[in-house]
Amino acid sequence: MASAELDYSIEIPDQPCWSQKNRQGGKEAGKQQPVVILLGWGGCRDKNLAKYSAIYHKRGCIVIRYTAPWHMVFFSESLGIPSLRVIAQKLLELLFDYEIEREPLLFHVFSNAGVMLYRYVLELLQTHQRFRHLHVVGTIFDSGPGDSNLIGALRALATILERRPAVLRLLLLAAFALVVILFHFLLAPFTALFHTHFYDRLQDSGSCWPELYLYSRADKVVSARDVERMVEARLAHQVMVRGVDFVSSAHVSHLRDYPTYYTSLCVDFMHNCVQC
């Protein structure tokens, strides 16, 4: 079972509160219990994700929370090592372990760390026979995705490492900067032969369900322009997309600064996606 090998949290409400209506007669045909998978930002703790989880759990959704290890996000991905693909497969296998694979599925993805993992989820949904029939209804992106932004990535990594000894912190930051400069700038043409950057992969994704992008021009980690370019690219692929600029909130701080508005955006999006 994937659940024995993955450090995740799951919340299952006692009763589903979603009715699935028969479109012709208007009679209740059964119960839907949407599943929401939260993919956390780099260095995110489960207690941080739990605040977002509550938005959905209170409304009768099953919620799975997971944050990829920071060393995989910052180093494995930068080196072109697809170790997150294994995690993505285990996450999707959880749906079968809990026998919820037939329920509507929504992703809520945070920052580039969440997007890097989500990228492999998308690939598995399109290529893996077992996952091709999962019913994904929508994706929310919070504070991402961002294109190659070394300064922003260093800021994010510095935040994760702030409790580490100063010497170790400086060594890891220097090592990360060197890897990015080498593989994403100097050797970019060679790297592209065996590893496509997650931002480029997401731009050209074949997924067709609605997407909601929540970002801010005050974000110092992920550029608002990167998010807006992604919105434009997805619209060009005829995907139903909406972008919301919170203007003044910092990276992954939109819920904290605008709790009512943020919650209403997420809940309304979920309702619309599940009922389509």
Curated annotation (Swiss-Prot):
The chain crosses the membrane at residues 170-190. It holds the Pfam family DUF829. It is found in: Nucleus outer membrane. Expressed in liver (at protein level). One of its GO terms (biological process) is negative regulation of ossification. It comes from the Eukaryota. Disruption phenotype: Knockout mice do not display severe skeletal abnormity at birth, but exhibit late-onset short stature. They show craniofacial dysmorphias, including hypertelorism, thickening of the calvaria and minor sclerosis of the skull base. Platyspondyly is also observed, as well as short limbs and underconstriction of the diaphyses. One of its GO terms (cellular component) is nuclear membrane. InterPro entries: AB_hydrolase_fold, DUF829_TMEM53. It is a single-pass membrane protein. Gene3D superfamilies: alpha/beta hydrolase (3.40.50.1820). Coiled coil: none annotated. Its main location: nucleus. Keywords: Developmental protein, Membrane, Nucleus, Transmembrane, Transmembrane helix. Negatively regulates bone morphogenetic protein (BMP) signaling in osteoblast lineage cells by blocking cytoplasm-nucleus translocation of phosphorylated SMAD1/5/9 proteins. Belongs to the TMEM53 family. This is Transmembrane protein 53. It comes from Mus musculus (Mouse). The lineage of its organism: Eukaryota, Metazoa, Chordata, Craniata, Vertebrata. The gene is Tmem53.
